[in-house]
């Protein structure tokens, strides 16, 4: 393939089309049209919680609980993410999408052109329209996602049954519940993370008198940052978390506040 433009040229080698396998016809178990903007964003948001080791394959991907509503979950044995989406699929099923396949879906979805509404009379409906994708459970443990008429992705799903994610969520009222400004908490954790990293990676959080004190202890130093909370019930109380877990959760949050709950005695 040769490309020529008014400032230069470029040549790229090509492969013979017969070297690429033809996708076989596969029976479809169930299919439906889904809001791709919501689904893909939720799957990408779950990626940081996926296990990175191969010892537990069912934790190495993002779980989709299909039905009405669709749920997205992931966990690595230490933490988990669970999202309930306002979407539906005509068949109730649980599938596990490999982590690398989720990244591929995000890339293809970002590059696929929007399909404008058939009755759009201005640019606004085209720009703001939700991007729909067609999803089908097909073949033997596979899922196919069609991005309009321009691209399709067929994924081999992870074999096995995912955990019962909701059973891992503690029931009952939390011992301590606090609402804080997410960007402010993120800044406080970043302020102490160097010392936390020098120690055991732990960030301590103490709730008292309407304040939250975030601190870390290293080998030869200690650092802390104090911030106001919006609302706290159950104080005084304290808890501790790995700083990377906190930052993975807080990083890029589009909301101004976040709620922290502990279900074990936090004193």
Task: Tell where the protein language model's regions lie, with residue ranges.
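Structural preference for solvent-exposed beta-strand-turn elements
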Residues: 1-267
């Amino acid at each position: 393939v040769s490309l020529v433009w008014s400032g230069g040229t470029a040549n790229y080698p090509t492969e013979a089309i017969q070297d690429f396998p033809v996708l076989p016809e596969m029976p479809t178990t169930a299919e439906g049209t889904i809001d791709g903007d919501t689904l893909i964003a939720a799957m990408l948001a779950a990626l940081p919680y996926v296990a990175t080791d191969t010892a537990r394959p069912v934790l190495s991907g993002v779980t989709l609980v299909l039905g009405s509503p669709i749920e997205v979950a992931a966990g690595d044995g230490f933490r988990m993410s669970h999202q309930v989406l306002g979407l539906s699929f005509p068949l109730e099923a649980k599938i596990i999408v490999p982590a690398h396949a989720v990244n591929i879906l995000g890339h293809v979805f970002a590059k696929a052109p929007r399909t404008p509404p058939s009755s759009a009379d201005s640019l606004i409906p085209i720009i703001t329209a939700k991007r729909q994708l067609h999803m089908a459970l097909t073949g033997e443990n596979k899922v196919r996602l069609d991005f309009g008429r321009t691209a399709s992705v067929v994924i081999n799903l992870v074999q096995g049954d995912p955990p019962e994610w909701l059973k891992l969520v503690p029931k009952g009222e939390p011992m301590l519940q606090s609402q804080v400004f997410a960007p402010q908490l993120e800044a406080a954790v970043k302020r102490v993370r160097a010392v936390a990293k020098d120690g055991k990676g732990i960030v301590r959080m103490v709730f008292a008198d309407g304040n939250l004190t975030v601190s870390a202890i290293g080998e030869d130093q200690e650092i802390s940052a104090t911030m106001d909370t919006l609302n706290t019930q159950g104080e005084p109380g304290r808890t501790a978390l790995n700083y990377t877990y906190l930052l993975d959760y807080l990083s890029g949050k589009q909301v101004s506040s976040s709620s922290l709950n502990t279900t074990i005695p936090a004193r």
